[in-house]
Amino acid sequence: MAKPAKRVAVTGAAGQIAYSLLFRIANGDLLGKDQPVILQLLDLPQAQAAVKGVVMELDDCAFPLLAGVVITDDPKVAFKDADVALLVGARPRSKGMERKDLLSANAEIFTVQGAALNEVASRDVKVLVVGNPANTNAYIAMKSAPDLPKKNFTAMLRLDHNRALSQLAAKSGKPVASIEKLAVWGNHSPTMYPDFRFATAEGESLLKLINDDVWNRDTFIPTVGKRGAAIIEARGLSSAASAANAAIDHVRDWVLGTNGKWVTMGIPSDGSYGIPEDIIYGVPVICENGEYKRVEGLEIDAFSREKMDGTLAELLEERDGVAHLLK
């Protein structure tokens, strides 16, 4: 007996990240190889023709799991009964644009989208914000959706997590799949803190294996933090395929579980680890039965506290920068 289709809303559907994302969702990579999906695609009126072109390509793949596609420029149509909402579209920073201008331009988008989710989405909708500044955009959407549980709103730090895994595998010579218990704390920005103090590879402590504080401080942390900028420098375009891959990882793990393994998600704080409530902050989590649970009780040393407070300061500044736009 075929499962009933799940509705997956994707914003910024004509964009580069969505182009890497939609075909994988339709192929079953997001919700499982036995789960039919209906894609509900949102983009601006001027992008509708481009979205139609992407849908022509989706049709031409003849994906067995793709049960339907909706194309719209209306958030209330896109989010209607959505089980998953991937908020990929955001206002990019243009030349000469101040960060506060970027924040307010995005606040406008995410208040509208949060309100639409509040009105029409499934009450169990799983929301992942990919569009930057992702943590604060997720915070704005959450605050604009008072009837939905706060825990439904998350921001993507999985790209930072995967970038850190790759750097650790290269440094230690261990297979990337063998590395467990990595944490990435804070904002999806160069201030975030990738933390491998608890990490193991094939049961061995990575900290002991690598045993190089200078590398951690001067190479590892900045490399992960500035990787997005390095890709733009090399490619002339921002990371799209790796961002789409991280979005798939994030939602798949949230829905299908992590088998006891740690992953990083930006989630609303409950006050633990000294992070004020409701701030959307990257923490290590374990997922099971469609829920995430933060890893509790980790020891925070002085260096880590400084790094975690630094990225928190940026998030508080962003929050305060949009406070007047939230009723």
Swiss-Prot record:
Entry protein name: Malate dehydrogenase
UniProt GO MF annotations: L-malate dehydrogenase (NAD+) activity
EC annotation from Swiss-Prot or TrEMBL: 1.1.1.37
Purpose: Catalyzes the reversible oxidation of malate to oxaloacetate.
Residue sites binding NAD(+) per the record: 12-18, 106, 113, 130-132
InterPro entries, sorted: L-lactate/malate_DH (IPR001557), Lactate/malate_DH_C (IPR022383), Lactate/malate_DH_N (IPR001236), Lactate_DH/Glyco_Ohase_4_C (IPR015955), Malate_DH_type2 (IPR010945), NAD(P)-bd_dom_sf (IPR036291)
SUPFAM superfamilies: LDH C-terminal domain-like, NAD(P)-binding Rossmann-fold domains
Keywords of the record: NAD, Oxidoreductase, Tricarboxylic acid cycle
Residue sites binding substrate per the record: 93, 99, 132, 163
GO biological process: malate metabolic process; tricarboxylic acid cycle
Catalysis: reaction(s): (S)-malate + NAD(+) = oxaloacetate + NADH + H(+)
Active-site residues annotated for this sequence: 188 (proton acceptor)
